[in-house]
């Protein structure tokens, strides 16, 4: 697949690339933002490893994770991904997103997630897309609802590897049929 550039009214989503490390670490290294993430990048070295791994993934023939940076007015303000590795047969994708705290509350996550959802159904051979968030993260749950997803499980749990903290997890889903109906 050719590396896609996704455009919205205000944002550009482009594949993660070498050279993005500093701007990504501004949010990926912020514990206030990443406290609800599986693997926050506590150190700049971890962010560099993340960028290298995801830049290489874009070059891979067997690509399973489509990691984008979210660019607003020339600045990387967040990231989002569609990940197929959560199922053994790669039959569905899981979406995720993160926004620099200085850019929250402006609809950027919803705008990026909607573009990512469109990319996923338009380019990947799947019929379901999931997203999950910590039950204490109403903003992400709101994004899921805004892009047309439906809550399918509110009884899940997640344990964060770096802290050992266990919390509730919400899982939302949208099917290809639902997405197509929503688009008209």
Question: What annotation goes with each model-predicted range?
Answer:
Residues 1-35, 52, 69-184:
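Acyl-donor (CoA/ACP) binding surface of acyl/acetyltransferases
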Residues 32-55:
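Conserved GNAT-fold acetyl-CoA-binding loop/helix
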Residues 58-63:
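Short loop/turn motifs at secondary-structure junctions and domain boundaries
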Residues 65-67:
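PAS and PAS-like sensory modules
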């Amino acid at each position: 697949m050719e590396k896609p550039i996704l455009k919205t009214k205000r944002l550009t989503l482009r594949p993660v690339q070498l050279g993005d490390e500093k701007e990504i670490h501004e949010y990926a290294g912020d514990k206030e933002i990443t406290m609800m993430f599986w693997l926050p990048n506590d150190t700049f070295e971890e962010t560099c490893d993340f960028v290298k791994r995801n830049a290489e993934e874009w070059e891979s023939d067997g690509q399973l994770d489509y990691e984008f940076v979210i660019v607003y007015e020339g600045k990387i303000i967040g990231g989002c991904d569609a990940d197929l590795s959560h199922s053994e047969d790669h039959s569905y994708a899981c979406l995720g997103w993160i926004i620099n705290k200085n850019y929250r509350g402006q609809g950027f996550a919803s705008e990026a997630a909607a573009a990512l959802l469109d990319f996923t159904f338009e380019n990947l051979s799947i019929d379901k897309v999931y997203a999950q968030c910590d039950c204490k993260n109403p903003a992400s749950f709101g994004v899921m609802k805004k892009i047309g997803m439906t809550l399918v499980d509110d009884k899940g749990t997640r344990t964060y590897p770096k802290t050992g903290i266990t919390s509730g997890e919400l899982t939302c889903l949208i099917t290809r049929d639902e997405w197509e109906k929503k688009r008209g």
